[in-house]
């Protein structure tokens, strides 16, 4: 597994990292936000020989069409196989940039510099790369590890609150699936005042431990998908609508629904289900789901990559801190779990 570097001085640490890698050219992938907010931190005086390409931010741009633009720019920059791609951005950019690097000339090296809380705790670890296709999340992709991941909590200062909140959902998830004490240590009331550096390090350690035991998701790694079967379906459903949900906001809905399924199917204690419900509703509030939307969300669940044949396979909780995988769930059970969410009252 490639080095994950926690950095309080990203500019110096990146230069030191690059000095140890023999490369022909550097190509920098940024989005319109990170170009303004993050690039100057890394390269205060950026030289023109550093080729760069700017993409539009957001999940809706995580497509093959954007990849083709990136590949065209890489080709125009005459990158050879010794070039290195720097991905400076959130999860969308890292997923797509790594995918582009893996395909270009059968693969060039890349370094991920995640700038959002979500990508620092989650997307930058574990080598899953890809893009959305025909409305399906991460439908096309590969497993490939970056040369290095540079995690600088400093970049979080540039994030809007809603983006911080989105990333916090994955931190909560790591506690729910692997570490009850971690979950209980999270400050839900004043989550904005969290010690992000400490939480990121702990979350990355949890995820790295799981991924190192099962890099290609044959078994144990599936526990990281808790909340994601239903959560991804909501995220995908709302991608085109005006009721746009960030990844973490959608996963928060998914985790409440899947905690209910855990209670029904695995006996997750009612008091723990209540604790999970309370945690997510107090941080994320509640979204309104119309009756007519549920069928479409269910259809999207069926398309999930984790399924085997027509059976929907879920990762569910035996208890907080103990997650298991490959639990078959029927369409009607998913519908019931969404009804449970719909009927919840805010405290």
Identify the residue ranges that each predicted region occupies.
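ATP/NTP phosphate-donor binding region
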Residues: 1-84
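Non-catalytic interfacial helical region
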Residues: 71-88, 97-112
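Generic secondary-structure signature for well-ordered alpha-helical cores
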Residues: 76, 145-148, 154-161, 169-181, ...
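Short glycine/serine/threonine-rich phosphate/pyrophosphate-binding segments
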Residues: 92-99, 120, 232-233
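A glycine/threonine-rich phosphate-anchoring loop and its flanking beta-alpha core
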Residues: 99-191
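C-terminal charged capping/lid subdomain of soluble metabolic enzymes
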Residues: 169-171, 270-347
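Active-site segments that bind and position negatively charged phosphate/pyrophosphate groups
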Residues: 185-295
């Amino acid at each position: 597994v490639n080095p994950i570097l926690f950095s309080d001085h990203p500019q110096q640490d990146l230069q030191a990292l690059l000095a140890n890698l023999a490369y022909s050219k550097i190509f920098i992938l940024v989005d319109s936000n990170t170009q303004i907010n993050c690039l100057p931190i890394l390269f205060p005086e950026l030289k023109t020989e550093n080729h760069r390409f700017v993409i539009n931010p957001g999940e809706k741009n995580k497509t093959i069409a954007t990849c083709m633009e990136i590949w065209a720019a890489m080709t125009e920059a005459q990158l050879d196989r010794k070039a290195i791609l720097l991905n400076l951005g959130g999860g969308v950019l890292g997923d797509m940039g790594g995918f582009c690097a893996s395909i270009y000339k059968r693969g060039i090296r890349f370094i991920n510099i995640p700038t959002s809380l979500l990508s620092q705790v989650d997307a930058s670890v574990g080598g899953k790369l890809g893009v959305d296709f025909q409305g399906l999340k991460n439908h096309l992709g590969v497993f490939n590890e970056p040369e290095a991941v540079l995690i600088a909590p400093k970049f979080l200062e540039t994030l809007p609150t809603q983006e911080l909140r989105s990333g916090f959902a994955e931190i909560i998830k790591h506690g729910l699936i692997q570490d009850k004490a971690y979950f209980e240590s999270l400050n839900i009331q004043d989550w904005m005042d969290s010690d992000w550096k400490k939480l990121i390090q702990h979350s990355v350690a949890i995820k790295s431990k799981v991924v190192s035991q099962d890099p290609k998701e044959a078994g144990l790694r599936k526990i990281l998908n808790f909340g994601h079967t239903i959560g991804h379906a909501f995220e995908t459903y709302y991608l085109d609508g005006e009721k746009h949900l960030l990844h973490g906001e959608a996963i928060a809905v998914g985790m409440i629904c899947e905690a209910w399924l855990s209670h029904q199917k695995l006996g997750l204690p009612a008091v723990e289900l209540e604790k999970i419900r309370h945690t997510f509703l107090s941080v994320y509030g509640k979204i309104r789901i119309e009756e007519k939307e549920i069928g479409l969300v269910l259809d999207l669940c069926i398309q999930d990559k984790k399924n085997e044949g027509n059976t929907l396979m879920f990762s569910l909780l035996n208890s907080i801190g103990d997650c298991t995988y490959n639990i078959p769930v029927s369409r009607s059970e998913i519908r019931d779990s969404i009804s449970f969410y719909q009927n919840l009252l805010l405290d």
